[in-house]
């Protein structure tokens, strides 16, 4: 019986650890989504800025800088999209593991009562 309680306690600790990790991933996913949104806004801003700059302003260097910034922001958006996908996969894996632990714990508790 003591062995069952010890195993049950270990499973509860594992469940809590996984739940905390899942919550952390959810926060990181939200953070990535905010960063994606912010960088998309920057890309739009730079697109609009490029439309307003006229060739007669003789600021070709500024255009080059703006284009570089635009590319940098687009790359950041892509990086955050990839990171969000990776975090979502980890979250799904943890959720599956939590279900398995919960089922295992329920079976163990049922066995312990018998």
Curated annotation (Swiss-Prot):
Cellular localization per UniProt: Cytoplasm
Coiled coil among keywords: yes
Coiled-coil residue windows: 70-111
CC per GO annotation: cytosol
Pfam family of the protein (one): DUF496
Repeat as UniProt keyword: no
Keywords from the named record: Coiled coil, Cytoplasm
SS bond partners: none
NCBIfam families documented for this protein: PRK05423.1
Protein family (similarity comment): Belongs to the pole-localizer TmaR family.
Function statement: Pole-localizer protein involved in the regulation of several cellular processes.
Alphabetized HAMAP family for the sequence: Pole_loc_TmaR
Protein name: Pole-localizer protein TmaR
Origin species: Actinobacillus succinogenes (strain ATCC 55618 / DSM 22257 / CCUG 43843 / 130Z)
Gene: tmaR
């Amino acid at each position: 019986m003591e062995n069952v309680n010890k195993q049950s306690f270990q499973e509860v600790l594992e469940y809590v650890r996984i739940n905390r990790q899942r919550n952390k991933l959810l926060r990181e996913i939200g953070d990535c989504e905010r960063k994606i949104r912010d960088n998309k806004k920057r890309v739009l801003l730079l697109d609009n800025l490029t439309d307003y700059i006229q060739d007669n302003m003789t600021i070709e260097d500024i255009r080059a800088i703006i284009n570089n910034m635009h590319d940098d922001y687009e790359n950041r958006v892509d990086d955050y999209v990839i990171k969000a996908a990776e975090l979502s996969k980890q979250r799904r894996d943890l959720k599956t593991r939590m279900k398995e632990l919960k089922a295992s714990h329920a079976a163990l508790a049922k066995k312990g009562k018998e």
